[in-house]
C-alpha cells in the first residue's frame, strides 16, 4: 500500500469515522509521508476529535483496529491533543490532512 492508496481509503471512510468516532480531522504523518516506508512499516495517523467528544480508551483502540483492518497494515494512532511539544512540532510540520 502506498500513500495515495491510504489517502483514498481514508477519504472514502471519512464521514463514517466522523459519525462513529467523532473524528474532526485526520491526517497521515511519518514514514509514508516521507516516502521512507518499508515492508514492515506501520501507518502513523494523527486524529483530532470533535470538541466535547467523549471517547473511552476502548473506543480509541477500536478506531485504531478498524483503521488497521481498513488499510490492511498496522496503524499507530496518535491523538492530536496528546502531542508533546518537542515531537508534536515535527509531526505537525509533516502531517498531510485529508
Question: Where in this protein do the model-derived segments appear?
Answer:
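Catalytic core of pol beta-like nucleotidyltransferases
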Residues: 1-25, 33-39, 50-98
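A short, structured beta-strand/loop element
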Residues: 40-45
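Hydrophobic alpha-helical positions that pack around
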Residues: 28
Amino acid at each position: 500500500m502506498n500513500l495515495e492508496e491510504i489517502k483514498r481509503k481514508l477519504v472514502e471512510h471519512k464521514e463514517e469515522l466522523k459519525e462513529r468516532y467523532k473524528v474532526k480531522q485526520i491526517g497521515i504523518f511519518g514514514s509514508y509521508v516521507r516516502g521512507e516506508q518499508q515492508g514492515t512499516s506501520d501507518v502513523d495517523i494523527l486524529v483530532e476529535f470533535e470538541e466535547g467528544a467523549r471517547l473511552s480508551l476502548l473506543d480509541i483502540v477500536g478506531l485504531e483496529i478498524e483503521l488497521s483492518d481498513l488499510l490492511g497494515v498496522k496503524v499507530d494512532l496518535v491523538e492530536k491533543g496528546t502531542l508533546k511539544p518537542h515531537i508534536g512540532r515535527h509531526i505537525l510540520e509533516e502531517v498531510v490532512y485529508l
